[in-house]
Every structure is written in C-alpha cells, then in structure tokens.
C-alpha cells in the first residue's frame, strides 16, 4: 500500500494520494488520522540501530553479566565506564507552558565542549567523574585509579566498558598488569551502547542540566554538569536509580524493517 511503500511524512501527503487515487476527500485532518489508525497505521519515528549488531554476542554478554552478579562476593563491586562530551550550547526541549507565553533560550556565544571520563556503581549510585582535555589511555588510567581509591577495602572491582581503542591501549594493559591491581576489565560487545547503563546516565544528565537551560559561560556549564554527576546523582540515587538500570534487552535487526 502507499503508506508502507513510501513512508509519507505528513497526513497531507496521504490525503493527497487518497484524493488522487480513490477520489475521496477528508474534510478534517482528525478524520483522516482516525481512518489511518483504524487501518493499523501510526505516526512514529524510526529507531536508530547500529549496522553490525550481533544477537548472539548480546545474549552471551547478558548471560555472562547475570552469572557474574549472581556469584559476586561481598568484597567485590561492579562499575560501568564511558566517556561523554557535553557541548556548551542551548538544547531546547518540549515543555508545558502558559499559552500566552512565547518561550526562548539565549544562545551561547560559542560551542565549547567538556570531556568527561566517568564511572558509576549501579548498586550504590557512587560515581567517579574526571574532566580531561582528551579522553585517551592516560585518562583511562586516571579513572581506574580513582575507582580503586573509591573502594580501598575491596578485593576485586569489575569494570565494564566499550571497545574504544584507548581502553585497549598498551599503556592501560601495562598499568593493569602491575602487582596489587584489583581491577578486571570486561568489554561490552561492539556496537552495543544499549548494554552500557551509563549511557542512560548521560541522558539523565541532559534532561536535568542542559535541556531548556542557559549557562553564561562554559565554566558555569561545566560546574553544573560535573556537580550533577558527582554530587546530585549519588545523593539522590534512590530517586534516580530506576532511570539508570541494567535491565538489558537484545536488539535484533531482524525484528525491524530497516529503511534504506
């Protein structure tokens, strides 16, 4: 049918096709929408999925992670690591407001960004967030050292992270190989950011810090961002934890009609 074949962006396009092909004219947009819904159609935005997703690797990772948690000793911990690069720029987001008001956000004078290499413990909400000039092997080691300092009494700290080159760097491997290191790295399957809960923390950060907010300087923006991640999240973890979970799901490209 026309809708399935062309994926029209507007009801106007659908109405024009119906009038041209069937000779029917809908007097109202609401009436046309009701008809489309009765035909099993809906207006929605396609999801974005990575090109090289592997269902079996996702399943194996989730099973391995569940087994680790089930066998986790009291003197062990699990953290998730990632980098994020918030930009000092206005980020408008939909909101409720009085109908008589026309809303606006002042644009910033530039588009500076801050680089954060961070970690979160989902069990406690404790975070480690370091601001760096460049996210690389050196910042990875700094973050791992900060994690070790957070848990001086633990025997083993499991750190889950993505396959960025700097996470695999020789410098990082040499640091891990030194006597007394208590960190074990676990790599999330490639192209699977949905298997790293800290990605959800970044979304929470944007909703609370950047959406519909204006910061006069990048320094103020950095203070607000790092303050949220370092202080607000751990302090309010009981209220925030449901937004940053390890409730993993498998994304199978075969479940989607991939638009080309």
Where are these regions (language model features)?
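RNase H-like two-metal-ion nuclease catalytic core shared by retroviral integrases
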Residues: 55, 162-163, 170, 186-210, ...
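C-terminal anion-handling pockets and recognition modules
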Residues: 31, 74-76, 198-260
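A short, amphipathic alpha-helix used for macromolecular contacts
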Residues: 1-28, 72
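Extended, low-complexity cationic-aromatic segments
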Residues: 60-145, 246, 251-260
């Amino acid at each position: 049918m026309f809708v399935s074949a062309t994926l029209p962006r507007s009801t106007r396009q659908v109405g024009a096709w119906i009038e041209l092909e069937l000779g029917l004219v809908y007097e109202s947009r609401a009436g046309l929408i009701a008809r489309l819904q009765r035909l099993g159609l809906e207006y929605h935005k396609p999801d974005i999925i990575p090109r090289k997703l592997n269902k079996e690797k996702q399943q194996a990772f989730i099973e391995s992670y569940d087994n680790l948690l089930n066998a986790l000793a009291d003197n062990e911990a699990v953290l998730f690591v990632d980098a994020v690069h918030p930009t000092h720029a206005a980020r408008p987001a939909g909101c409720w407001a009085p109908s008589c008001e026309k809303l606006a956000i002042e644009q910033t004078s530039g588009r500076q960004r801050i680089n954060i290499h961070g970690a979160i413990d989902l069990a406690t909400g404790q975070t480690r967030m370091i601001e760096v000039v460049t996210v690389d092997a050196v910042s990875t080691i700094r973050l791992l050292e900060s994690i070790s300092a957070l848990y001086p009494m633990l025997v083993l700290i499991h750190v889950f992270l993505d396959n960025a080159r700097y996470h695999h760097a020789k410098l990082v491997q040499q640091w891990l190989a030194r006597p007394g290191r208590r960190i074990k790295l676990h790599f999330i399957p490639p192209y699977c950011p949905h298997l790293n809960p800290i990605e959800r923390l970044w979304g929470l950060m944007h909703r609370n810090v950047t959406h519909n907010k204006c910061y006069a300087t990048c320094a103020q923006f950095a203070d607000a961002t790092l303050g949220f991640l370092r202080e607000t999240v751990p302090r309010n973890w009981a209220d925030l934890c449901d937004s940053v979970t390890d409730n993993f799901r498998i994304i199978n490209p075969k479940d989607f009609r991939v638009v080309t």
